[in-house]
Amino acid sequence: MKSLVLILPLFAVLTGIGFVSCGSNGGEKAGKSSIRRATSDATWLKNATQVTWLPRQVSGRYDGASALDNIRQASAGHAVKRSSYGTAPGGYVRLDPRMLRAMKILVKEGFTFRVTAIAGASHSRTSRHYAGLAFDVDFINGQKVGYVNPHWKRFLARCRELGATETLGPGDRAHSTHTHAAWPR
């Protein structure tokens, strides 16, 4: 029996059998190096004066899953909290390192912005927010996002260049006052 206990873990490693924690979104490849990189970029972003983080949901709720809560949780190396109201599923998810890296590059290239949602809030049922792959912004370069803001189109174009495959803003349904950028699953 003792030999079986010793052999099973070795067998699991050799055959590639893995275990997924309940906090995983199932699609992420959260190796140690990607978690370290995401933690480092989240810390950098949390401390960057060019980015502000909404401390509550746009709906007004304080549920521990605001953009500010999410960036603090990610910078501490943790999975971040998702809201559990409306269509939000609750639970936790790790933020995607590609998205965090893109946000960092946007700052380094001179954009200032306010993040209103990452994994929290209530979105469409299949929203990539719930997978830690999307963020919303309502101010860019000191101006409210809207048709008259001259910066939002360039901001979203740069997000696409940095890997976002879903970008929404003024002119798209339910996005007249904010931008949405999401990375692939």
Regions found by a protein language model. Name each.
Residues L100-H129:
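Active-site-adjacent loop/helix surface patches within enzyme catalytic domains
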Residues M1-L4:
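Positively charged n-region of N-terminal signal peptides that target proteins for export
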Residues I7-G16:
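Bacterial N-terminal signal peptides
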Residues S24-E28:
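Bacterial lipoprotein signal-peptidase II cleavage site
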Residues G31-T43, A48, T52, R56-I71, ...:
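Catalytic cores and adjacent binding grooves of peptidoglycan-active enzymes
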Residues L68-V80:
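Short, compositionally biased low-complexity segments
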Residues G77-E109:
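Helical scaffold of the NTase/Pol beta-like nucleotidyltransferase catalytic core
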